């Protein structure tokens, strides 16, 4: 289903996102307008505009309550979710509940607004799409978007919805470690040797995944996956922030906790110090006037940073052990350990991992920040039918991260699809009634590994009615679970005797956005986009009239023009320029056409005088009399 134009791969990260495109037989990771190959997953709302990416992150200290980040830690979760509740303690912005779903609350253009996490993520995706469009010089319609391997069904659905709101045709949702494995596998293409067991250790800003794959002749088969959808670089920052806030309190008897701006400035300094500590053993922190005029100058050693995070760092090995157990592999059977995600640059994490694998060298051949987007771009090319030899013989076999099943008598979880089953997949099992003359059955679908459904996660439920009266155990009800390549589930139940069936696509019951919601958000996204564009045009018009005014002013004040222009004409221009400058000071928020009108007004006064000046100027060359002024459109 090749859409028009190339398809892109987007790594939608917790803290940073990255976009790539596969063309001319290779992947390009695309830099944004600031020249950065990763873009902060930040959206800020101000009195006048909406900012996304670097611009949003750069102003966060001035505007902490209206700058949203970490949408990925909210997406597809319930407001009551314990992790959401604990995260809210760290966030400077407000999270409120609407129908059990979390929404962020901000003040935008003087009004209170609330947004679902899908909407915030769609704004980040829009930015990534625009970055790609600027580079490719055309519209982009299709994309592959990545998610942590351990994301559950509702988190995947919500991510797909975010893509839809952006106006993208989401070709597929793929797992981040799988995408990284493609990047690694392509990188290693042509190396000798048959099947390889590869462990991908992916520790990013907010999530942690471990996946074990076998790669053989372009076939990538995921054997197992484990992880923590809630562990990453930000958690390491949090530990340092708490530690230094305590130190500040001890030294200066002041608690910065309630002051969001101070906490934010400290966090930014901590993030920078953490990066420094990956290459140096000590980092200094210098923040002028952190709180109530008190400067905060201190330093932190690598050893101290490691001690603050010792339990978190050590904890990264548990999912590694679990993934090995699930793949039925011994650690000696892993041929390659591939590091992905910025947090894998931390020396202590590398050392723990290397020691766990008895000193085996870690593979650092792929850029940890870009590998996921790289793999997603390759997968996008495959899905729209790219025929270049590098990708045509790649096959990606992914797995479902959690077991899926239904509740049977006594609240027992009966799995139909075991975790780590390769997808797409379809499984059917026959069930029967529990009591005599039972005319309907309730099919309740769960995901999880526990024996009782109450400990697992309810995905959805439906009734199959109209079962003819019969003794218990006689009716035969066939339940089919069908998972597509995106990991999205359809469940069907059919009564064999009557052929009656009912089915559910696991979506809405898990707090997924309805079609109407998505359509509304698509329109709103368009509206915000056009507002952003209108604002850009407005600012451009303002800058144009401003630079025109100052240029004219400089031209007539130029010493070289003395004697070529009458004092009367000169004063006429200068008075008009001053009038426009005063008007600009008072009207910073005027409309585009008002600025254009002001510029034309000024031109009407200046043009006759300036043209007279250049015609009448000596030598008739005209251009020697100072800068010529072009109208800025």
Swiss-Prot record:
Residues 613-633 are annotated as: Disordered. It is found in: Cytoplasm, Cytoskeleton, Spindle. The modification Phosphothreonine is found at residues 408, 414. Its main location: cytoplasm. The modification Phosphoserine is found at residue 403. Keywords: ATP-binding, Chaperone, Cytoplasm, Cytoskeleton, Differentiation, Methylation, Nucleotide-binding, Phosphoprotein, Spermatogenesis, Stress response. It comes from the Eukaryota. GO terms for biological process: male meiosis I; male meiotic nuclear division; negative regulation of inclusion body assembly; positive regulation of ATP-dependent activity; positive regulation of ATPase-coupled calcium transmembrane transporter activity; positive regulation of G2/M transition of mitotic cell cycle; protein refolding; response to cold. The keyword Transport does not apply. GO terms for molecular function: ATP binding; ATP-dependent protein folding chaperone; disordered domain specific binding; enzyme binding; glycolipid binding; protein-folding chaperone binding; tau protein binding; unfolded protein binding. Residues 2-389 are annotated as: Nucleotide-binding domain (NBD). The keyword ATP-binding applies. Residues 616-625 have a biased composition (Gly residues). It holds the Pfam family HSP70. InterPro entries: ATPase_NBD (IPR043129), Heat_shock_70_CS (IPR018181), HSP70_C_sf (IPR029048), HSP70_peptide-bd_sf (IPR029047), Hsp_70_fam (IPR013126). SUPFAM superfamilies: Actin-like ATPase domain, Heat shock protein 70kD (HSP70), C-terminal subdomain, Heat shock protein 70kD (HSP70), peptide-binding domain. One of its GO terms (cellular component) is cell surface. ATP binds at residues 13-16, 72, 205-207, 271-278, 342-345. Molecular chaperone implicated in a wide variety of cellular processes, including protection of the proteome from stress, folding and transport of newly synthesized polypeptides, activation of proteolysis of misfolded proteins and the formation and dissociation of protein complexes. Plays a pivotal role in the protein quality control system, ensuring the correct folding of proteins, the re-folding of misfolded proteins and controlling the targeting of proteins for subsequent degradation. This is achieved through cycles of ATP binding, ATP hydrolysis and ADP release, mediated by co-chaperones. Interacts with FKBP6. Interacts with ZNF541. Component of the CatSper complex. Interacts with RABL2/RABL2A; binds preferentially to GTP-bound RABL2. Interacts with SHCBP1L; this interaction may promote the recruitment of HSPA2 to the spindle. Interacts with MOV10L1. Belongs to the heat shock protein 70 family. PANTHER family: HEAT SHOCK PROTEIN 70KDA (PTHR19375). The N-terminal nucleotide binding domain (NBD) (also known as the ATPase domain) is responsible for binding and hydrolyzing ATP. The C-terminal substrate-binding domain (SBD) (also known as peptide-binding domain) binds to the client/substrate proteins. The two domains are allosterically coupled so that, when ATP is bound to the NBD, the SBD binds relatively weakly to clients. When ADP is bound in the NBD, a conformational change enhances the affinity of the SBD for client proteins. This is Heat shock-related 70 kDa protein 2. It comes from Mus musculus. The lineage of its organism: Eukaryota, Metazoa, Chordata, Craniata, Vertebrata.
């Amino acid at each position: 289903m090749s859409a028009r134009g190339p398809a892109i791969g987007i790594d939608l990260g917790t803290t940073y996102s990255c976009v790539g495109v596969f063309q001319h037989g290779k992947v390009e990771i695309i830099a944004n307008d600031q020249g950065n190959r990763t873009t902060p997953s930040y959206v800020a709302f101000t009195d006048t505009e909406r900012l996304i990416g670097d611009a949003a992150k750069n102003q966060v200290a001035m505007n902490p309550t209206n700058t949203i980040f970490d949408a990925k830690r909210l997406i597809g979760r319930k407001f009551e979710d314990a992790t959401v509740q604990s995260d809210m303690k760290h966030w400077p912005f407000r999270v409120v509940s609407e129908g059990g779903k979390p929404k962020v609350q901000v003040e935008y253009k003087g009004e209170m607004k609330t947004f679902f996490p899908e909407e915030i993520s769609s704004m980040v995706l829009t930015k990534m799409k625009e970055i790609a469009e600027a580079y490719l010089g055309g519209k982009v319609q299709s994309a592959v978007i990545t998610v942590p391997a351990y994301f559950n069904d509702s988190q995947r659905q919500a991510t797909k919805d975010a893509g839809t709101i952006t106006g993208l045709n989401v070709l597929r949702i793929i797992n981040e470690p799988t995408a990284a494995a493609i990047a690694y596998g392509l990188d290693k293409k042509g190396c000798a040797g048959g099947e390889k067991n590869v462990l991908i250790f992916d520790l990013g800003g907010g999530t942690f995944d471990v996946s074990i794959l076998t790669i053989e002749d372009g076939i990538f088969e995921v054997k197992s996956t484990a992880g923590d959808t809630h562990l990453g670089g930000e958690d390491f920052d949090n530990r340092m922030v708490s530690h230094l806030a305590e130190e500040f309190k001890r030294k200066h008897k002041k608690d910065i906790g309630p002051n969001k701006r101070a906490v934010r400035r400290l966090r930014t300094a901590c993030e920078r110090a953490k990066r420094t500590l990956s290459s140096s053993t000590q980092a200094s922190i210098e923040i002028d006037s952190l709180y109530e005029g008190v400067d905060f100058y201190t330093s932190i050693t690598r050893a101290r940073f490691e001690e603050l995070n010792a339990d978190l760092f050590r904890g990264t090995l548990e999912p590694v052990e679990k993934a090995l157990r699930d793949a039925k592999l011994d650690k000696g059977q892993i041929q390659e350990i591939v590091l992905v995600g910025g947090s894998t640059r931390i020396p202590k994490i590398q050392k723990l991992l290397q020691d766990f694998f008895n000193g085996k060298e870690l593979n650092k051949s792929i850029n940890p920040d870009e590998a996921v987007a790289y793999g997603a771009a390759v997968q996008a090319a495959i899905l729209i039918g790219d025929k270049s030899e590098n990708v045509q013989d790649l096959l990606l076999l992914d797995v479902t991260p959690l077991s899926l099943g239904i509740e049977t008598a006594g609240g027992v979880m009966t799995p139909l699809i075991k975790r780590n089953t390769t997808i797409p997949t379809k499984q059917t099992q026959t069930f029967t009634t529990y009591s005599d003359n039972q005319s309907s059955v309730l099919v309740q679908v769960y995901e999880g590994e526990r024996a009782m459904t109450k400990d697992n996660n309810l995905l959805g439920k439906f009734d199959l009615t109209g079962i003819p009266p019969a003794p218990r155990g006689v009716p035969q009800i066939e339940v089919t679970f069908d998972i597509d390549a995106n990991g999205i589930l359809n469940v069907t139940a059919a009564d064999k005797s009557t052929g009656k069936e009912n089915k559910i696509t696991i979506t809405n019951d898990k707090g997924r956005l309805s079609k109407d919601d998505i359509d509304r958000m698509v329109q709103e996204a368009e509206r915000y986009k056009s507002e952003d564009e209108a604002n850009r045009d407005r600012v451009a018009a303002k800058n144009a009239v401003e630079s025109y005014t100052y240029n004219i002013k400089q031209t007539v004040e130029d010493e070289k023009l003395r004697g070529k222009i009458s004092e009367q004409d000169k004063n006429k221009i200068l008075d008009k320029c001053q009038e426009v400058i005063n008007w600009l000071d008072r009207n910073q928020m005027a409309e585009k056409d008002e600025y254009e009108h002001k510029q034309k007004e000024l031109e009407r006064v200046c043009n006759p005088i300036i043209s007279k000046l250049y015609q009448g100027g000596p030598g008739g060359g005209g251009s020697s009399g100072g800068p010529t002024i072009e109208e800025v459109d």
